């Protein structure tokens, strides 16, 4: 089982737990979970897993997207899998988003959203209205890589899309795009330049009009070595649904002084003022925390193992009920219980 698949399914479990159990839900002995061990549950095709999404009130149903194997769905907790994207012209998947208010509505971003010699690009964003049985292409074809999509919890037609762009050269179809009509049209709302794309976007769990986006300036050469650090990289915040954005950089590394590269970001579901960011840089790399909704940042862990291979992973997640329990993914998955 690849690290990417382990990490994606592990973090999927965290996101699926975000909603509290319904009244009268069956109780369980927590000691049973302590006896569980990692095991391969598939699917057995397509290489590394880049995307995963689940439905909180349907815990047996979840989806994974792999770098060259399309989208797979299970409805029996991973015992069996069905490929549901094979009739589409691309198999490279970077993002899967389920509309929280209507879990039959799925959005899939193609192009895995990495900068590495063996990457695979896609051809835009897709939508399903029937849980993945049928798909329609929506656009953003020239974006080539879509590593993240977030959907308004109350409105399945409002979404923000992170578009990284072509890995091999400049292009204008990069940045954060917004749709308010279910993907019929897209508006570019955060853009820096033709060399800088968006690699991550997250919503404030208490206010969907507040979002945080990560821009990343990087370029993959046709040979082994690429450029993964650039002046365009940084974190941005909106409080008006994406109409306006501003950089939030106080305490974070800069490119000019520290060689800033890729950043991964998350918001604590139980405390929206607490954010964590994994920051790749030539100096001052590490795990950063903000306790004031991103206005200031503090380096809390500089152990290089926590951010190893950050240009590939850059994943950080917080426990749904405990803002001090944090998970990061590098070569291995790390856990902290003290914030």
What is the predicted role of each segment?
Residues 23-339:
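Beta-propeller blade termini and top-face loops
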Residues 6-18:
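Bacterial N-terminal signal peptides
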Residues 1-3:
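N-terminal secretory signal peptides that target proteins for export/translocation
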């Amino acid at each position: 089982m690849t690290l990417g698949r382990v990490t994606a399914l592990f973090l999927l479990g965290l996101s699926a737990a975000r909603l509290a159990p319904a009244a009268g839900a069956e109780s369980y002995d927590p000691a049973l979970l302590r006896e569980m061990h990692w095991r391969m549950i598939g699917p057995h095709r397509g290489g590394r897993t880049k995307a995963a999404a689940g439905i909180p009130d349907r815990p047996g149903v979840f989806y994974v997207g792999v770098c060259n194997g399309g989208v797979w769905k299970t409805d029996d907790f991973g015992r069996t899998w069905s490929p549901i994207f094979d009739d589409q012209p691309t198999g490279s998947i970077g993002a899967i988003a389920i509309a929280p208010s209507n879990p039959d509505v799925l959005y899939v971003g193609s192009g895995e959203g990495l900068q590495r010699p063996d990457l695979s690009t896609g051809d835009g964003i897709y939508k399903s209205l029937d849980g993945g049985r049928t798909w329609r292409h929506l656009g953003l074809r020239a974006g080539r890589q879509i590593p993240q999509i977030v959907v308004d919890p109350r409105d399945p037609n409002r979404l923000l899309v992170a578009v990284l762009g072509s890995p091999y050269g400049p292009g204008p179809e990069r940045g954060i795009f917004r749709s308010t009509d279910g993907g019929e049209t897209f508006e570019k709302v955060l853009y820096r330049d033709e060399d800088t794309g968006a690699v991550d976007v997250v919503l404030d769990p208490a206010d969907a009009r507040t979002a945080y986006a990560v821009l990343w300036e990087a370029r993959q050469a046709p040979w082994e070595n690429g450029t993964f650090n650039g002046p365009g990289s940084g974190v941005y915040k909106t409080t008006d649904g994406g109409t306006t954005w501003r950089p939030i950089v106080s305490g974070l590394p800069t490119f000019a002084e520290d060689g800033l590269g890729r950043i991964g970001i998350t918001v604590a579901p139980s405390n929206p003022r607490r954010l964590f960011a994994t920051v790749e840089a030539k100096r001052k790399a590490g795990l950063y925390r903000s306790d004031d909704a991103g206005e200031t940042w503090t380096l809390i862990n500089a152990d290089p193992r926590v951010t190893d291979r950050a240009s590939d992973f850059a994943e950080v997640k917080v426990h749904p009920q405990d803002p001090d329990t944090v998970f990061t993914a590098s070569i291995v998955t790390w856990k902290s219980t003290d914030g």
